[in-house]
Every structure is written in structure tokens, then in C-alpha cells.
Amino acid sequence: MIEFKNVSLVYPNGTQGLKDVNLKINEGEFVVIVGLSGAGKSTLIRSMNRLVTPTEGELLIDGENILPYSSRQLRKLRTKVGMIFQNYNLVKRSSVMKNVISGRLGHVGTFASLLNLYPKEDVALAYRSLQRVNIAEKVYQRADQLSGGQQQRVAIARVLTQQPKIILADEPVASLDPPTSHQVMTYLRKINKEDKITTIVNLHFIDMAMEYADRIIGMRAGEVVFDGPASDVSEETFEEIYGRKIREDDLVGGQDNE
């Protein structure tokens, strides 16, 4: 379980990233966070693996407050919390396999990984992860030879290889076209259901949020302004979250726009 208790974050320049956030996210949930640019979506998601550090409150993962963690404790935390980024975060000049097996880095250590000394089971796990996102045929290609959608699938395979308890996906489809976006979201949803991995995704497109989320968290100006099941969400809910009328560019992730 992930629990935010009165969590606030003020950046060094005085910007309020999070404001008195109280949330509980249960094991195995598929949660989508929505809000305008600058609403605090990325700050919220990045606080869960301490890429940013809240300045007030407590942030508990499995009952333990992660805010006072040492760098050694953070390394251990990041082994069980996988992250998927908008820009894929792959080593472009390395092969697909080398990128995916780097998901084992926290398990084998830096020295072994530098020498490419991964156990056979890890190599087999990496290959199975590529098969699960239907990209195993690209295993020996360089990452920079792949399309954006293929690179994001490699990033998902890397997270799978990590065998995390939690997956955080920060705007994973923002750089992709609608059909590819749906493909990536379908893989994330499938992994969540099959492996029971808690999955938290930031999305801009509200129709896509409605299609894939079990639960939607709405943010505005660093505050949680809505938290409930996707089935309870209406257009009016999104207008309340966004503080304005819904526009066509909020919906370009929709199947009808493919």
C-alpha cells in the first residue's frame, strides 16, 4: 500500500508542487492521475520513488515512511518501484536486450552489470519480458533504430524485468500517436491485471483515462481535487478538475480520433 499523509512539497524556487495531499493507493490498483500541465501530476508520481522529496508530511510504502531514507535505502526502494518515462529513458546506442536486462541492475549490482555478468535466469527473464510486449524480434537491434512506440514497449519490458511491486508511468503516451498510445496502455493494463502490480499512470487525455483506469485522481495546483472510481466520473468532473470547459485537444487520445 502507498499512503500520503499531509504531504506537501515546495520547490527551492518557492513553487508549491504538492499541497496537503492525503491518499491511499491499495495493492494491485490501476490508478490514473489527470490534471492540466503544472497541476502536480509528475511531482506526485515522482515523490513515490523519491525522485523529488516532499518537504512536509509522511509518505508510506508498505507501512514505512520513505522520506527520511538514506541513499542505500533509496536504492533498495527503487528496485521494487519501477518507472516508465515519457521520453523512454533508454540507452540509445545499446541493444534492446542490454536496455531490458538493465532492469536487473538493482538485483545484481553495478560491478556485475558493467561486466555484463547477468545470470542465465535474468537473460531468460528479459527475453520473456520482450515477448510479453511483442517486441522480442528486435532483441539485437539498437534502441535508436526503433520507433517511439517500440521504444516505449522496450521500456515496459525493462520494468517487467525489474520485477517491481509498483509501476509508475509518467506521461507514458504523451509522445505517441493515438493508436500507439492505446497499444502501450493496453500492455500496462494487462501487466497490472496478470501480475497484480500496483500501477499509477499520469495521463493528459481524459477519454484514455476513462477507458483504462479503475480509479481516477484529479489534481489542480498541487492539490487532489477528485479521487474516485472511473465509473463515477463525468464531463462535469473533468471540468471541475481542470477549472475550465473541456476542449477537443483534451480528447485526442480517443479511439474515434485514430
Swiss-Prot record:
Gene label: phnC3
Job description of the protein: Part of the ABC transporter complex PhnCDE involved in phosphonates import. Responsible for energy coupling to the transport system.
Protein name, as recorded: Phosphonates import ATP-binding protein PhnC 3
Membrane association type: Peripheral membrane protein
Entry binding sites for ATP: 35-42
InterPro entries: AAA+_ATPase, ABC_transporter-like_ATP-bd, ABC_transporter-like_CS, ABC_transpr_PhnC, MetN_ABC_transporter-like, P-loop_NTPase
Family, as annotated: Belongs to the ABC transporter superfamily. Phosphonates importer (TC 3.A.1.9.1) family.
One cellular-component annotation, GO: plasma membrane
GO MF term (any one): ATP binding
